């Protein structure tokens, strides 16, 4: 790997000649691959028992409770995890191992209001959604209109029920969400030095996205995060770069400007080391000290309400707001209740139902006022209300698929599961009754344990495929 001389000089100065040689050698080694289990849909135990051999899982990633290394090229004829139907059931997320650390460390609890400020493509947001367990609220934001599409897809695939996705600048969000959030994750844009082994384009673009450019963005993002955080709340700051100006010095500068913050210690396992320059509470993940590409992480607690702007009630919580983006209903609409009673098991979801156009949406907590913001996803889209009937969405299937009264399961290596994911109509046994069914994928020989891919309507032995066009895949 050919590195820019300016970068080499900087890293030698940071690490010293001997440790830099170890770092440089690690860049020539084979990178590690990671997969994180989505425990909203499958337990770690079931994942290992049913999918461990298929994916070729090797061992647990030590700084996670749901991440595993896998070896995609060790065996012949091994399918890549992203090519398997189980991926399309949202059972796991493919993620670089060290990138799993920040969201694991942010102490999110069910019921919290959480902001992922730089969220795309969604690896950390989906983990935060798992931690919330369907309670509280996750706001996942990304400023890029293009990248936010991947963010929405990954959150919907994971079955996260309590998320609003915004496509805004931190400045505009801060005007709405003043003092609103309990926890904020800032996975800041950075010079990407921890991506060099994984992505050669990161090496080529290093000169373009230099530290001084990135530091300016990071400084601004952190200051807006401060405005949006409640007293007593936590900011988890992370980068995938090694430059102290974007890491320890950025945190030091922020704390000097906002002295009401203090650093909290992070758990360090599997080769994770302390931050540099005496910042022992922070964490460094180096590629020559562990199996991962590299990260910096620090957690800050807001101790007092030092500035007047944080004492104001958040705009999105004010009772006087006349929200024009949606209409909150007093109860679930009759069309939805009728569908649930006929096709689902268990109690109807308890929370807030609201409509925007023909769409029925749901959140477990009071929906925030998002008037004036770009919001491509305003909660869980349950489906459409049209002509006095309810038609479920793909999001509904991914979030509540296990509650369908009727399910049809195809083996993961069958032609039928491939046909389903391509959006084709499928002939099924006459043993299946007519009506709505969850369509699921099962492990060969264990098709009674199916994982939901979507829905279909059976009529006279034919399964009408309801898998959405935008999701269809050739596998």
What are the functions of these language-model segments?
Residues 146, 182-223, 240-248, 269-270:
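Mobile active-site "lid"/loop adjacent to the S-adenosyl-L-methionine
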Residues 181, 234-237, 242-361:
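Class I S-adenosyl-L-methionine
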Residues 133, 229-231:
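Helix-to-beta-strand junctions that scaffold the AdoMet/dcAdoMet cofactor pocket
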Residues 1-14, 18-48, 52-54, 303-475:
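Polybasic, low-complexity RNA-engagement segments
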